[in-house]
Amino acid sequence: KTVCTVGKIDDIFAHRGITRSNHTHDNASSCDAALKFLKDDFEGLLFVNLIEFDMIYGHRNDPRGYGDALEAFDRKLPELEAQLRTTDLVIIAADHGVDPTTPGTDHTREHIPLLAFGPRINCKINLGIRETYSDVAATIAENFHLPPPSFGSSFLSSLVPDSPSISP
């Protein structure tokens, strides 16, 4: 399978295990790059980092900018959704919490957002508070018929109850 990355993901993984990358530096160009990869109709993983939420707004204590960036991303989601194939799974999460309204610039929250959607996804469920962030990795592994990681529990069956996996 192909592994495409957008943003600083290539640096985070030392350019290992990546088939194609587009190293972007802001949310808008990251969204545009993601849309371009989706239009290429590849089979595999598209891993996108939206750097501004963390670097520009979260760690810089800018709640208004953070809110504006969220609204801009929300406006891009319909475009992304329109490019999805019937078997695609989108997972939106953060790697940590940074509350831009609190004093200091360190990570502030244990819990992060976790949203999943796609054409075959049961979007009317609450995944609850997951035991570990590794659940995302376990879900991706199951989706691609890979061995489960040592940690984490897949929530794929909650998203697509009638199918053990959604990717061919």
List the predicted regions and their residue ranges.
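Feature captures the catalytic ectodomains and active-site-proximal regions of enzymes
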Residues: K1-P168
